[in-house]
Amino acid sequence: MTEQALLSELDRLVSEERNPRTMDIDLLSSLAIVRRINDEDHLVPAAVEQVLPQVAQAVDKVVDAFRVGGRLIYLGAGTSGRLGVLDASECPPTFSVPEGMVIGLIAGGVDALQHAIEGAEDDPSLGESDLRNIGLTSHDVVVGIAVSGRTPYVIGGLAYAESIGATTVALSCNPDSTIATMAEIAISPVVGPEILTGSTRLKSGTAQKLVLNMLTTASMIRIGKTYENLMVDVSATNNKLVARASRIVMQATGCGAGEAKRVLALTDNEVKLAILITITGMPVDEARKALKNAGGFLRQAINANKA
């Protein structure tokens, strides 16, 4: 693409427009600057609210994928890629899902998490090759993340995903973007011009983070990773999380700290199992079987085995 063509393309993007509400921001005090930023940030949840039906559609597709052994895969460059990697990396400790069930891919690879990798996002073939390298299948869901909706790395990845029958989702912050027209589901929260012109790590990045939070959290809730609003599948891998596990058992059952600690010791810190045993009085082996019979849904296991 020529420089003139690129300039023309950027001129059409809402995310590249100048914000009339922040034209004087370089004249303001520190407090006034952060107030102005905060004012703009208030626009983000409203923009996300407009696309909740599309987010819910994507959640349903992710749940369907998980149920047949498929994966959720994020694909992005720069800030968009980093946000995908961040969200994916939180899933194993939060929900005790295996590494690789949710994957974040970023143009330029791991080095791009800390450093700008020049040109990595400009090659559509790299998006395809990164998906090939993880063995993408038709059971997977690929979420292409790009504020502009025109990042070649993401376009190439989504095109490949579509070609093999994987579910495709586009997350951008410009209406009718290139990736939005490509994907099966388009999620396009339009937050308007940034506080600093073109700095899409700001409002656009915040909108993306909110949507990614929803995709994984809602999907994990739907496959039984919570009980009420408690993270009952949390992996107790450090002192803080061991304490959290005890607290969750106490909150779910009303038992004391000593009892929670005792039952967690019996279950090797499996919170779901500890709660089921505490509420029903079942032996460990029977409780484990009951939980399996309920498909991992703790509420169902409790209801089926209450005295």
Swiss-Prot record:
SUPFAM superfamilies in the cross-refs: SIS domain (SSF53697)
InterPro entries under this entry? Etherase_MurQ (IPR005488), Glucokinase_regulatory_CS (IPR005486), MURQ/GCKR (IPR040190), SIS_dom (IPR001347), SIS_dom_sf (IPR046348)
One GO molecular function term? Answer: carbon-oxygen lyase activity
- Is Lyase there in the keyword field? yes
Q: What EC numbers are recorded for this enzyme?
A: 4.2.1.126
Q: Which residues form the SIS domain?
A: 62-225
In terms of Pfam families, this protein maps to: GKRP_SIS_N
The protein's annotated catalytic reaction(s) are:
N-acetyl-D-muramate 6-phosphate + H2O = N-acetyl-D-glucosamine 6-phosphate + (R)-lactate
Keyword Repeat among UniProt keywords: no
Any idea which UniProt keywords this protein has? Carbohydrate metabolism, Lyase
Residues of the active site: 90, 121
Q: Which GO terms describe its biological process?
A: 1,6-anhydro-N-acetyl-beta-muramic acid catabolic process; amino sugar catabolic process; N-acetylmuramic acid catabolic process; peptidoglycan turnover
* Metabolic or biological pathway, per its Swiss-Prot or TrEMBL entry: Amino-sugar metabolism; 1,6-anhydro-N-acetylmuramate degradation; Amino-sugar metabolism; N-acetylmuramate degradation; Cell wall biogenesis; peptidoglycan recycling
Note, other: A lyase-type mechanism (elimination/hydration) is suggested for the cleavage of the lactyl ether bond of MurNAc 6-phosphate, with the formation of an alpha,beta-unsaturated aldehyde intermediate with (E)-stereochemistry, followed by the syn addition of water to give product.
Q: What does this protein do?
A: Specifically catalyzes the cleavage of the D-lactyl ether substituent of MurNAc 6-phosphate, producing GlcNAc 6-phosphate and D-lactate. Together with AnmK, is also required for the utilization of anhydro-N-acetylmuramic acid (anhMurNAc) either imported from the medium or derived from its own cell wall murein, and thus plays a role in cell wall recycling.
Give the matching NCBIfam families. Answer: N-acetylmuramic acid 6-phosphate etherase, PRK05441.1, PRK12570.1
Q: Which HAMAP family does the entry mention?
A: MurQ (MF_00068)
Listed under subunit, the entry gives:
Homodimer.
Q: Which family does it belong to?
A: Belongs to the GCKR-like family. MurNAc-6-P etherase subfamily.
- In Swiss-Prot or TrEMBL terms, this protein is called N-acetylmuramic acid 6-phosphate etherase
Origin species: Brucella anthropi (strain ATCC 49188 / DSM 6882 / CCUG 24695 / JCM 21032 / LMG 3331 / NBRC 15819 / NCTC 12168 / Alc 37) (Ochrobactrum anthropi)
Name of encoding gene: murQ
